[in-house]
Amino acid sequence: MAALQISSCASQISSEVLIARVMQIHASISTLSSLRPSKQVNSLFSNLVKLCILPSSIDITALPEEVQAMRESLINLCGHAEGLLELEFATFLSKIHQPLNNLNLFPYYENYVKLASIEYRILNESGVSQPRKVAFVGSGPLPLTSFIMATHHMKLTHFDNFDIDGAANDVARQIVASDPELEKRMKFETGDIMEVQEKLSEYDCIFLAALVGMSKVDKVKILGHIRKYMKEVGVLLVRSAKGARAFLYPVVEEQDVLGFELLSIYHPTNDVINSVVLLRKPAF
């Protein structure tokens, strides 16, 4: 998760030891009465991320059935915890003076800065440096990627943030309202992206958050829906995961993006969690 990216060491870890330790942490997380930020919650998830960014040669597709089931459960727990962490901090930010000038108070802000820089470089290398209009699907209560892109990289671009949670959008909207210039070019839409159709054709670039479509079936459906309605030659940036990082996030594979032109795939080897898959809808 972007919110929990931390520094790794260079130690190699065997698949057997990795799986055993991940299962142990999953068991501990599963017994918690709440995933709201606390010393215990933060410690467990920090240890999990440290483990998953260690160099390893694990093949996620070859995991035994019971380990795959644990992995799916763990991804859901990670997503829930990340959402609660962002909501708590976004609520705090919305109540202070100049919240957009204080984003760096968020403990993992620099990790979002790193990821946004990587994604902007990938877009720039594919000729998409200053899109007129961008959509971010699954923006949440603290849409740091949109904030960073809009203020550091795409300073004239209009951003529409889509989230299924109206309360999350309300908090994010309060933060943006503190900056009249940014508020003019950043809006929030509440609803299921599967119900958004013609509007998707307005965007030069669409970001798909890693936790939108938690299961393989849902992810493929969402990718197909976006491809159907997005503009021709528009680009879609999808966050994925590789290796042990796939205990934290769903994986998007090449067979999941049929009908798209695959422009590039980036896999991190440092403290960044997310892989980045850049796609283009072909012109027909």
Regions found by a protein language model. Give the residues of each.
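S-adenosyl-L-methionine
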Residues: D170-Y203
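A short SAM/SAH-binding and catalytic strip from SAM-dependent methyltransferases
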Residues: I193-E195, E202-K219
